[in-house]
């Protein structure tokens, strides 16, 4: 397969695995034209970074050999158009049944997430809840960090929004996130900046109720 010359070795390996499936060190070495030691070094780094995983495959003759394939994390590096499909479906739903129907879908998603995570908050004080919420949001791709202010309030900052295209069109998604945080934290939550409203990040100020 012809590959762009300006791709890094790591990206070339990822692209090879995407198009060919799991590959052995020998197969990668043959396609890249570099030493096996260099390939193993790249594979080791990529495996530590969670981009690839190895498994042993039996051969017709000889000992089993290790092959390397993409993880779900690596699959996420390749372009996807899920938000376009989702927006198209939501727009069709809105045209057919009205905006309230779309809003109810966001409400149901909020309730589902609340049920999913409420057990994580049991027995925790507010700081621990905020820290756990930041972990949850990070796991979902929001690039979240939290800070404690001198007045005892907390600030939760989300530097990325995986559903930004949807939130830009349907602001009710943002309102549901705010209500979800209030429910999980059992606290007063105020959003002072929002990516969907031309902010650089989403910022939530959290106060004890």
PLM regions and their residue ranges:
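Basic, Lys/Arg-rich alpha-helical nucleic-acid-recognition elements, primarily the DNA-binding modules
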Residues: 1-72
């Amino acid at each position: 397969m012809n590959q762009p010359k300006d791709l890094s070795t790591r990206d070339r390996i990822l692209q090879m695995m995407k198009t060919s499936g799991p590959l052995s060190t020998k197969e990668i070495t043959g396609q890249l034209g570099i030493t096996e030691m260099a390939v193993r070094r790249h594979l080791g780094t990529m495996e530590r970074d969670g981009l690839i995983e190895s498994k042993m495959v039996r051969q017709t003759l000889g000992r089993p050999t290790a092959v390397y394939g993409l993880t779900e994390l690596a699959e996420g590096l390749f372009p996807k158009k899920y938000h376009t499909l989702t927006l198209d479906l939501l727009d069709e739903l809105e045209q057919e049944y009205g905006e309230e129907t779309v809003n109810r879908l966001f409400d149901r998603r909020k309730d589902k997430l609340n049920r999913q995570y409420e057990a994580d908050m049991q027995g925790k004080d507010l700081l621990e809840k905020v820290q756990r919420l930041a972990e949850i949001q990070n796991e979902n791709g929001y690039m979240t960090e939290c800070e404690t202010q001198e007045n005892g309030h907390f600030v939760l900052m989300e530097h990325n929004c995986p559903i930004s295209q949807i939130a830009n069109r349907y602001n009710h998604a943002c309102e549901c996130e705010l209500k979800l945080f209030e429910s999980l934290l059992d606290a007063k939550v105020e959003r002072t900046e929002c990516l969907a409203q031309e902010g650089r990040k989403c910022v939530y100020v959290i106060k004890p109720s």
